């Protein structure tokens, strides 16, 4: 088994990590930063930009720059939270043929897992550049409160990116792993409060020593998969729009370019207000009307921001209360509170958490990196590099089937430790019923229609019998990734039917395979482009050095030699303008061949006359002493 990397696939930022020589290393990307913006841009020429490069061009390309796509993963288009998002993002969210929420870019419909795969590819490449070897296996984190279809969609994204996803792990659990690995032995209970860019999770985790093993057991988890830093940004954007409307009478909501600039400004202002009590947003030329250009200038204080988002922060308290209740633990019994996710840097969030749990949160856990670090530890456990660690996670939501009267009958209750398997016997509702439909549901409501539908399948050819006589055994099996497998068996005939709940990831097996092939083709194109660029650069360098050599040689070069070299130079320059790598390499070789005698002649002459060779070197040394420029600041005395 090769190296297994840990990836935190975040709503706002993503991060990749590896366990190396017993220590967890967060890997810097090509831009030199430890986290990468989860932003993907599709340029008009077909180029795909990921991360900082995508973020930089967002203002000029708002319709084709995608961010916070994780909020759409595994969701239906008609869901209220999706409809709300449609109003707030400059890109187009559309309805897929199967009813899922997809996005449209340059007239092409794309599934969220396909887009998330671009971020995962960037994380994979970051790790490969650092390790100097191919990476094919990963542990990827998801919010603890992600349902089955969202987990399956994340796994699909990994496959499209060329990764074998060895495990899907919950973000708070990963953070607890990162926190607890080096802690003193002994039992203690921690709360992981994870408020990220798009989701909120809270988990109660017990870290214990059992027979010399470091055991991390999740006692309960709760959360909200549509509450995060993006919502805080939206409140600020709305405030700026309202202020501008009051002042100018113009509504910026219909202007994608202005909204993209406002988004960037809101995010920046929010971050600044975590360390300052006031900041100013200044966006010149935000729009224009008949009277000329308009500028947006708004001063905002920390207290104003807090008043705008106070209800969002309060919304995190109910899941905390429910998690404690489900775990059967009083808040006074919590030993440590760990904050994860960039939004937890906000002083109001820290204040509320301290007040609720009655203790200060720990400051020794990096909220942006802890999740990826925990994923890397889990990867090392799966690879066998880390021993004596046992991770016991839970299923976040109740799983069951629809029974007579539209009722949801639970088979696996929420917060059940996984992996787990549970069976229950059901029967028919009508006399001589020859088939039953198994409708699999996930959620906490008693009414089946109020819960998330994960899929349906039929068990047919049941022998005729009075209602209530046939015995249909339904089995639910959740694997370590939290992904559900369902089976139904007629106990009289032994006939059975089973499915892995995966259709709701939004992609069929054929679609996933096609996307994997597309990704491989793109990868091959990228490699060819790099090789072509390298050949062009080599050719350019040779053209430059040869022209310089001919100029330096002067009349020492015969007319015949000069003609041959000039012809080879022209041929190489023409080849460089083309797209044929082999042609460029052939012309490079040709030019090297015809210019070699001149180079040898020059070298021999320098060897015979070292003083002549020293003179240009002295001139170069003098030239090196030249100061490019000196600036003196002139004070403007007005």
UniProtKB/Swiss-Prot annotation:
Induction summary: By stress conditions e.g. heat shock.
Biased composition (Basic and acidic residues): 616-625
Domain of life the protein comes from: Bacteria
InterPro entries attached to this UniProt entry: ATPase_NBD, Chaperone_DnaK, Heat_shock_70_CS, HSP70_C_sf, HSP70_peptide-bd_sf, Hsp_70_fam
Modified residues (Phosphothreonine): 199
GO MF entries: ATP binding; ATP-dependent protein folding chaperone; unfolded protein binding
Pfam families noted in UniProt: HSP70
Keywords from the UniProt entry: ATP-binding, Chaperone, Nucleotide-binding, Phosphoprotein, Stress response
Keyword presence, Metal-binding: no
Region of interest: Disordered: 605-625
PANTHER family for the chain: HEAT SHOCK PROTEIN 70KDA (PTHR19375)
Family affiliation: Belongs to the heat shock protein 70 family.
Function: Acts as a chaperone.
Protein name: Chaperone protein DnaK
Lineage: Bacteria, Pseudomonadati, Pseudomonadota, Gammaproteobacteria, Pseudomonadales
């Amino acid at each position: 088994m090769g190296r297994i990397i840990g990836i935190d696939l975040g709503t706002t930022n993503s991060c990749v990590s590896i366990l190396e020589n017993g220590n967890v290393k967060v890997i810097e990307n090509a831009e030199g930063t430890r986290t990468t913006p989860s932003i993907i841009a599709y340029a008009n020429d077909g180029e795909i930009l990921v991360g900082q490069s995508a973020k930089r061009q967002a203002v000029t390309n708002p319709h084709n720059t995608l961010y916070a796509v994780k909020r759409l993963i595994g969701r239906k288009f008609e869901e209220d939270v999706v409809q709300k998002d449609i109003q707030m993002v400059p890109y187009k969210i559309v309805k897929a043929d199967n009813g899922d929420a997809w996005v449209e870019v340059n007239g092409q419909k794309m599934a969220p897992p396909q887009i998330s795969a671009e971020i995962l590819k960037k994380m994979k490449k970051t790790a490969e550049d650092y390790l100097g070897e191919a990476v094919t296996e990963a542990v990827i984190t998801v919010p603890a409160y992600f349902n089955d279809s969202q987990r399956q969609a994340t796994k699909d994204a990994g496959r499209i990116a060329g990764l074998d996803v060895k495990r899907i792990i919950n973000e708070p659990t990963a953070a607890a792993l990162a926190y607890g690995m080096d802690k003193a032995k002994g039992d203690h209970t921690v709360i992981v409060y994870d408020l990220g860019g798009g989701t909120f999770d809270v988990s109660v985790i017990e870290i214990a020593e059992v027979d010399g093993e470091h055991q991390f057991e999740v006692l309960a988890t709760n959360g909200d998969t549509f509450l995060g830093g993006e919502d805080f940004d939206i409140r600020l954007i709305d405030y700026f729009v309202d202020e501008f409307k009051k002042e100018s009478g113009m509504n910026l909501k219909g202007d994608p370019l202005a909204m993209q600039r406002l988004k960037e400004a809101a995010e920046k202002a929010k971050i600044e207000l975590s360390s300052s009590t006031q900041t100013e947003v200044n966006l010149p030329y935000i729009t224009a009307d008949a009277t000329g250009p308009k500028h947006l200038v708004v001063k905002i204080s920390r207290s104003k921001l807090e008043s705008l988002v106070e209800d969002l922060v309060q919304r995190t308290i109910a899941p905390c209360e429910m998690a404690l209740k489900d775990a059967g633990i009083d808040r006074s019994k919590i030993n440590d509170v760990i904050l994860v996710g960039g939004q937890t840097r906000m002083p109001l969030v820290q204040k509320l958490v301290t007040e609720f749990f009655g203790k200060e949160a720990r400051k020794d856990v990096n909220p942006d990196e802890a999740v990826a670090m925990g994923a890397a530890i889990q990867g090392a456990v799966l690879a066998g590099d880390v021993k004596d660690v046992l991770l016991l996670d839970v299923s976040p939501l109740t799983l069951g089937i629809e029974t007579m009267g539209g009722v949801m009958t639970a088979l696996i209750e929420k917060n059940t430790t996984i992996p787990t398997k549970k069976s229950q016997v059901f029967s028919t509702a009508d006399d001589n019923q020859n088939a039953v439909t198994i409708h699999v549901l996930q959620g906490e409501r008693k009414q089946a229609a109020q819960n998330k539908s994960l899929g349906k399948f039929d068990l047919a050819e049941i022998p005729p019998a009075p209602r209530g006589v046939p015995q249909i055994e339904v089995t639910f099996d959740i694997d370590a990734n939290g992904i559900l497998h369902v089976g139904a068996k007629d106990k009289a005939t032994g006939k059975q039917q089973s499915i892995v709940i995966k259709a709701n990831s939004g992609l069929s097996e054929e679609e996933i395979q096609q996307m994997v092939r597309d990704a491989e083709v793109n990868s091959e194109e990228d490699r060819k482009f790099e090789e072509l660029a390298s050949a062009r650069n080599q050719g350019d360098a040779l053209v430059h050095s040869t022209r310089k050599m001919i100029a330096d040689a002067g009349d020492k070069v015969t007319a015949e030699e000069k003609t041959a070299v000039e012809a080879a130079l022209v041929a190489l320059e023409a080849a460089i303008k083309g797209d044929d790598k082999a042609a460029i390499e052939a012309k490079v070789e040709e030019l090297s061949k015809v210019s070699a005698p001149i180079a040898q002649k020059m070298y021999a002459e320098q060897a015979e006359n070292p003083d002549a060779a020293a003179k240009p070197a002295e001139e170069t040394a003098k030239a090196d002493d030249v100061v490019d420029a000196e600036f003196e600041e002139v004070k403007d005395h007005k």
